[in-house]
Each structure stands twice: as structure tokens, then as C-alpha cells.
């Protein structure tokens, strides 16, 4: 097929407040050339995550970048070219993926992405419905099964701190569909309480008084905690609630330290989850992300998982992406926002 030599993208050269005119700008770039393991994808929809806002704010905090940086770490699109070592994909296939934080992102008409972190998109979902799922599903899956090492058949308890966001919602759904865990999730507003209940949480508690809220449910300790909201702010509560020999995982970095020795008496563990680790370090098991997305797509098509789409923005412009970033930065969003190109 005939492809253009250039493409439109939205990027930035300065880390500015999203309300400022040049916080995101429209640019023209050369069409990416796929590497030997790459798919070249014509992007049809994508989604914005907190990672996008963090990278935009930090990448050029004290400098102006020589070349615009393009972010975007969720996408659905059509394969239009591929590298010589790609297997399992053909031109014309519809795919979805989160991508690689070290490479240009999906805020562009075309994107080159490693086929080992890509899967065929769910057949029953629209582009917008599918676009909101890769990053949060991969994060939730890795946290549950790779970091916390949950065994699907064990009847234990999981506390999700930050249940109404994308990762929290995915964690609740996956845990309830694929394990025997009792899931407790935090929510602090009526609308978020309703949402996490719809996601499948067995108990909904308020994070403002976390220990007492959990224990009011008749639960003294929890076997697993996944924090997707505030690691340092909830540290003492997590230490109090974690069961002896339990495990805590988090995706939220923090300034300063926490006292890990508080976990020593319980022989409890703490482990980070970063969805980009496998692609960042080109790990030997990088293809596991393709395998996870394959299973997520099947679960979505079977109706066992629900898309987290709550809003769709339409059009490819800097203003549309700014609106999506404002939604994320408000910290009050429920579910996820997609951008339909």
C-alpha cells in the first residue's frame, strides 16, 4: 500500500502548564520506519493516562527540547507495514497496545511499535472502547500475577487503594474474574463508590480513615495491597493493615523515604510495578505483554471484562489532547477518556 512520507503529530518542547498555549503543539514529522521487530500502525484512537501528564511535566522541566517529544501510551490502529522479524501479524490487522516509554508515542497518525508488546484488538469493541484498555490492563495484570504473585485459586483478600481510576478499575475486574480474592477498594465520593461496586468490588471503603474503614467491614488484615493513589500518604495505614507475610505493590513514586523496617516484624514485602519495565530493558520475557493483551482481548470479547471508556473526544488537534490532559490532571476522573482520530 502507498504510504505518505510525513505525518501529523502532537508534541511539546517545553514542560508547561496544560492551560498554556504551547503546552502541546501540532507538528509534522517523517513517517516512522519500522525496525525488524516493529509494526507500523496507522493509529485510529488512543487514550491518555497519568503517565502522559507526568512525562510532559518532567521531560523539559528546566530546558527546551531540541526536537518535539511525542507521548501517548495507549492505542488502537491498523497495521500498514512490518519488520522482517515480525510474526503473527499481517498488513491490515487491527491491533492494540500501550507502547514503549523510550519511543515516540501514539499522539500521532502513525506509530512504530514492537510486535512483542502488541496484540490483536478485541473484535467486539469500538476503537475508543479498546484504546482505553492496554496500559491499565497490563499494569493490573502484572501487579497481581507478576509482582504480588497471586494464585488464582487462593481465597485471600486484596485492598486496592484508588479503585475508581483506570488501573484500580482494571485490577478489581481482573481480580474478580480470574481469582478467588475478596476485593476491597477505596472510593470517597458517591459516584466513585458506585463505579467501583459496578467493577465488582466486594467492599468499598474510604481512604481518609483507611484502617478503621477496612476493619469496620470485619477485616483485620489483608493479604495483598495494590496502591495506585498515594504510596507515602498511606504508608502507615498499609503497614498496619497488611497481614503477616503479606505483600504490598505500588505504581506511585514518592519524594523522600518510607520506613521499610516497619514491615520487618510481619515479614511483609514491598515491590514496585512499572508496566514499561519489560520494554525499557528489553527483557527476555518481553513477549509476555503480547500474551497478556491477548488474554485481555479474549476476556473483553467474552464480556467478562468491561471497557473503562467513560468519555470520547473526537479529532486530531492539540486542543483535543489538551482537554484530555486536563481530565487526567483534575484527579477526579472516573474510568478513562479516549480520543477518536
Give a label for each model feature.
Residues 93-94, 110, 247:
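Residue-level marker of beta-strand positions
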Residues 102-114:
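A structural motif shared across PLP-dependent enzymes of the aminotransferase-like
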Amino acid at each position: 500500500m502507498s504510504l505518505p512520507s510525513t505525518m501529523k503529530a502532537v508534541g511539546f518542547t517545553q514542560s508547561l502548564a496544560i492551560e498554556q498555549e504551547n503546552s502541546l503543539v501540532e507538528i509534522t514529522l517523517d513517517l516512522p520506519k519500522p525496525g525488524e521487530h516493529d509494526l507500523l500502525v496507522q493509529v485510529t484512537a488512543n487514550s491518555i493516562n497519568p503517565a502522559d501528564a507526568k512525562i510532559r511535566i518532567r521531560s523539559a522541566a528546566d530546558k527546551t527540547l531540541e526536537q518535539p517529544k511525542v507521548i501517548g501510551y495507549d492505542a488502537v490502529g491498523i497495521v500498514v507495514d512490518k519488520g522482517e522479524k515480525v510474526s503473527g501479524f499481517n498488513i491490515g490487522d487491527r491491533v492494540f497496545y500501550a507502547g514503549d516509554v523510550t519511543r515516540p508515542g501514539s499522539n500521532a497518525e502513525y506509530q512504530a511499535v514492537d510486535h512483542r508488546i502488541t496484540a490483536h484488538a478485541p473484535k467486539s469493541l469500538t476503537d475508543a472502547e479498546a484504546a482505553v484498555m492496554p496500559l491499565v490492563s497490563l499494569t493490573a495484570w502484572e501487579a497481581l500475577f507478576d509482582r504480588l504473585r497471586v494464585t488464582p485459586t487462593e481465597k485471600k483478600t486484596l485492598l486496592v487503594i484508588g479503585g475508581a481510576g483506570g488501573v484500580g478499575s482494571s485490577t478489581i475486574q481482573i481480580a474478580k474474574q480470574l481469582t478467588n480474592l475478596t476485593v476491597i477498594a477505596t472510593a470517597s465520593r458517591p459516584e466513585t463508590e458506585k463505579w467501583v461496586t459496578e467493577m465488582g468490588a466486594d467492599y468499598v471503603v474510604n481512604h481518609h480513615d483507611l484502617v478503621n474503614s477496612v476493619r469496620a467491614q470485619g477485616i483485620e488484615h489483608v493479604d495483598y495491597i495494590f496502591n495506585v493513589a498515594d504510596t507515602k500518604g498511606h504508608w502507615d495505614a498499609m503497614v498496619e493493615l497488611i497481614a503477616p507475610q503479606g505483600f504490598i505493590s505500588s505504581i506511585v513514586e514518592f519524594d523522600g523515604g518510607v520506613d521499610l523496617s516497619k514491615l520487618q516484624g510481619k515479614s511483609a514485602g514491598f515491590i514496585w510495578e512499572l508496566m514499561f519495565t519489560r520494554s525499557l530493558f528489553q527483557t527476555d520475557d518481553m513477549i509476555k505483554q503480547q500474551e497478556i493483551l491477548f488474554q485481555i482481548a479474549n476476556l473483553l470479547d467474552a464480556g467478562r471484562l468491561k471497557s473503562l471508556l467513560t468519555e470520547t473526544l473526537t479529532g486530531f488537534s492539540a486542543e483535543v489532547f489538551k482537554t484530555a490532559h486536563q481530565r487526567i490532571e483534575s484527579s477526579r476522573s472516573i474510568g478513562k477518556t479516549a480520543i477518536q482520530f
